[in-house]
Amino acid sequence: MSIKMPEMSLFSKKKTNNFLLDHMIELLLVVLIIALWIVEPVFMTPGNILNVLRNSAMKGVIAYGMCLVIISGEIDLSVGSQVALSAVIVAWVAKHLNDAGIMPLAAGAVVGLLVAILVGLLIGVFHAWARHKFGMPSFIVTLASLNILYGLAAIICGGFPITACYPDWYIFLGTGRIAGIPVPALIFVAVFFVFWFITEKTTLGRQIYAVGGNAEAARL
């Protein structure tokens, strides 16, 4: 019994260290929240928590997408420009379809969203194609597209905001509340569960982790 005790202690210590390494970010987040709570008690009030969730929702949704890229061992520097271009496309398509009398803003906004999603998909396909066709690092590919996409957004909008009387449902997505909870926060949470399901419960998620660990071994 006296011989096994050190082994058990060593195993327990190793298990604890592994847990700390695997959950370092979560633990640091908890420490940060507690520190802010002590310094400013109003930080943990329901109103402030909902406000933080609302303000961080868009960045959080973008971060989930970036996580998949980083897990696969790549990087995308053009995300901010893609967001800007997508927003401009939605507004431009909706406004011009309405001004041309083709469809009202409510329907035009839907078409604009679909066009923006398609453009984002094509940008991602182009990045992947350039990365594998020419063997260019994703850092270089996306660094170049960062400026190109931002320039396209500026050209489309002419450097000025695209103003229009957008439909209520469109505005509701950004400013509305359901049961007192901001809609962006609900979208953020919903995307989290989708992200978790993909990475933890699907073959695609395991493949992404495998590619990030060793792309050549994953290919074989």
Locations of regions flagged by a protein language model:
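Hydrophobic alpha-helical transmembrane segments
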Residues: 22-30, 52, 60, 81-85, ...
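Membrane-helix/interface signature in polytopic inner-membrane proteins
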Residues: 194-220
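Membrane-interfacial amphipathic/re-entrant helices at transmembrane-helix boundaries
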Residues: 2-63, 98-111
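Small-residue-rich segments of transmembrane alpha-helices in multi-pass membrane proteins
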Residues: 58-59, 87-91, 144-153, 217-220
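Single transmembrane alpha-helix segments in multi-pass membrane proteins
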Residues: 34-98, 129-135
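Transmembrane helix-bundle core of multi-pass membrane transporters
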Residues: 6, 134, 138-202
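Hydrophobic core segments of alpha-helical transmembrane domains in multi-pass membrane transport
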Residues: 25-38, 66, 91, 117-120, ...
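Alpha-helical transmembrane segments within multi-pass membrane transporters and channels
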Residues: 99-145
